[in-house]
Amino acid sequence: MAIKKPYRVLLYYMYTTIENPEEFAAEHLQFCNSLELKGRILVAKEGINGTASGTTEQTEKYMEAMKNDPRFAGIVFKVDEADGHAFKKMHVRPRSELVTLRLEDDINPKELTGKYLEPKEFYEAMQQEETIVIDARNDYEYDLGHFRGAIKPEIKSFRELPNWIKENKEVLEGKKILTYCTGGIRCEKFSGWLVREGFEDVSQLHGGIVTYGKDPEVQGELWDGQCYVFDERIAVPVNQKEHVIVGRDHFTNEPCERYVNCANPECNKQILCSEENEAKYLRACSHECRVHPRNRYVKEHELTEEQVAAALEKIEAENQVKLG
């Protein structure tokens, strides 16, 4: 029997009415700090969306307190074991929206949302004819892992998704639409918006990718790569039956599942790259970012101007060989 790890990472959300998000956020931060949790929780009039880490005892106390609050009756926690905290600090912040769609006429998932499919139902539906699977996440999340055959909307943020759908409406019309995201919260609104836009057969993966990966029956099957998560783990496994790497190194296009942020603080783009290429390319996504005066990789490793110049010269020489 596997030894259980001492920490837990909680992922949860609930659409429910919170009358005063600012006041609730301040009080909730105090409560989380009293339990010594770390994480990021968003609070809005429409509900709560959070991920937090702590010891087994700390997270149990938190879940119990939340479930005992009438506003959060029926809340579902997705729980991962961990060796330590998944966050450095604890943040609880009030927001106008739990997920940023910025629609002129907002969607209330309690009134309008797509049909919920449990993991086994979603697994079967993906394989049916005339079905289109849409990834409701951002492009860098898709690049690390996704359901086999899923469409990748070329978007940098969730609020760009409705426009992408409108631009590609002719491809989607008349099809069965399945959509999914990490934990389910984005699809609650997105699938509701699709229904309102006139798409008739819209379903969503209940509980998201995280729930799908833990399901004892499907065991994450038909998922390729890993699931991007917004904490220090960055990636978590999903498919328990096989591991297919779909991520590609930014510089060499070789299989890669290691994300870093571009060392230019004004860019900060997330790129997949090996440790070797991180060093070789000064953790920068482009030449402009490599020579940026505030390149963090250069500062962290205290590289001299001569060392930087030598690295740039080597890259340029290799590029010339490729072109030649």
Swiss-Prot record:
Keyword hit for tRNA processing: yes
Active site positions: 181
Reactions catalysed: uridine(34) in tRNA + AH2 + O2 = 5-hydroxyuridine(34) in tRNA + A + H2O
Domain of life (superkingdom): Bacteria
PROSITE patterns xrefs: RHODANESE_3 (PS50206)
KW ATP-binding (keyword) present: no
GO annotation, biological process: tRNA modification
GO MF annotation list: oxidoreductase activity, acting on paired donors, with incorporation or reduction of molecular oxygen
Role noted for this protein: Catalyzes oxygen-dependent 5-hydroxyuridine (ho5U) modification at position 34 in tRNAs.
Name used for this protein in its record: tRNA uridine(34) hydroxylase
Naturally occurring in which organism (per UniProt): Bacillus cytotoxicus (strain DSM 22905 / CIP 110041 / 391-98 / NVH 391-98)
Gene: trhO
